[in-house]
Amino acid sequence: MNRRDFLHKTGAVGAAGLSLSFAYQDQPQPPAQPPEPLVLPDPIPYPQDKPNVILIRFGGGVRRRETVEFPERTYCPFIYHELYERHGGVLFPNMEIESLDGIVTSHAQGTLYLLTGKYDRYQDISSKPLAERFVPQAPTIFEYFRRHYAVKSHEALIVNSEDRIDEEFYTFSNHHVYGIRYRSTVLSLYRYKTFLLRNDIANNRYEGRELEEKRRELEQMENRDYRVENRNLVAVPEIDAFWRKWHEHYGRSGLVNPRGDRLLTTLSLWAMRELKPKLMMINYQDPDYVHWGPRQFYTRAISIIDEGVREIYNATQADPYYRDNTVFVVVPDCGRDSNRSMPVPFQHHFQSRSAHQIFALIAGPRRFVPHQRRPVDELQQQIYVTKTIGQIMGFPTQLANERSLLAAT
């Protein structure tokens, strides 16, 4: 075969193949199949053989250096030496918030990573300076919990700081299968003030112009959670009864009850006695006051959280409802910088490597948590915490990251 014949024949074959290719492309393609709808069974009673879980958000941003890296110099001796070493659990000293585009090492974002088990980009919806009004699109751990188990909203509890009001409204997502029906309930001074104002108006404490001003104030406070159109939908009689007892004990001035993270400890202790939550998240945050400068604000705040965890642990041991049936999960919302050029190296948390580096501790009875004397050094992600709690309590977290911390034990 000469060159001319070869080109003629191969050209004919190529043209035939090309025409077949275009003919195939011209044929109508089958439509893409939509994803399978998320169909979930009806909620079931919470099993008696499953534990209560207390999630300690070691908030405000803390470094490993002052907490778990040097046990002999730790500012949280109870958490490390008692909760972990003596009472038994698993320490994950090599946890991080993954360095991805749009992933932020800050308090609100870190809290939502913990709640949803997903790294996500969040944008403030209020358009106010420094505001962090974020709306999770994926279900929160409390929604997973209440969708799987027939538990009341006050049994799925967040204890929140008076200084981070935006975090009051991370109680449910916009997910169509979950959402407000499976929300958590919040205890905070903001909620207490709302309760007092609503009660005052109902009991005719004000009149005339002052009454109109107070009604507008209450409307503004309630409307901060713009997604709740019907206030009766989120009314919880058990919470109202809780605040009435709080009022009888502490009054309304705010000068008698503890403040800062000590307040969160006190609210948690009251909640355990009055409400008996099965899943409770405590959003500590005072270490963040180091933004103002003095390093003692930071180290002292770590010690205050540690003391609070000790009080809460002792309360679980004194209460048959919680004794030998409660798992503690301790994890920071984010780390802090280690900037040696600053007078206080850990003053901020500006996306540095150290700000991404955190840890986690899980402690509880051996039937729920492995007791390992040696830390698990394998790299872990903050978002693994969600699946871990679901595994411990026996409920699925379908849209969260599928990895559990316990897989590394």
Where are these regions (language model features)?
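N-terminal export signals
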Residues: 5-26
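Active-site-proximal N-terminal segment of extracellular/periplasmic enzymes that hydrolyze or transfer
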Residues: 30-88
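Metal-dependent active-site segment of extracytoplasmic phospho-/sulfohydrolases and closely related
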Residues: 54-55, 304-346
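Active-site His/acidic residue clusters
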Residues: 64, 70, 170-174, 241-252, ...
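Short, structured active-site-proximal loop/turn typified by the sulfatase FGly-forming signature C/S-X-P-X-R
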Residues: 66-106, 155-157, 376
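Substrate-binding rim/cap in mid-to-C-terminal beta-strand-loop elements of soluble/periplasmic
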Residues: 109-121, 348-393
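Acidic, His- and aromatic-enriched active-site or binding-groove loops in soluble protein domains
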Residues: 121, 127, 175-209
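Polar, surface-exposed loop/tail segments
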Residues: 380, 384, 394-409
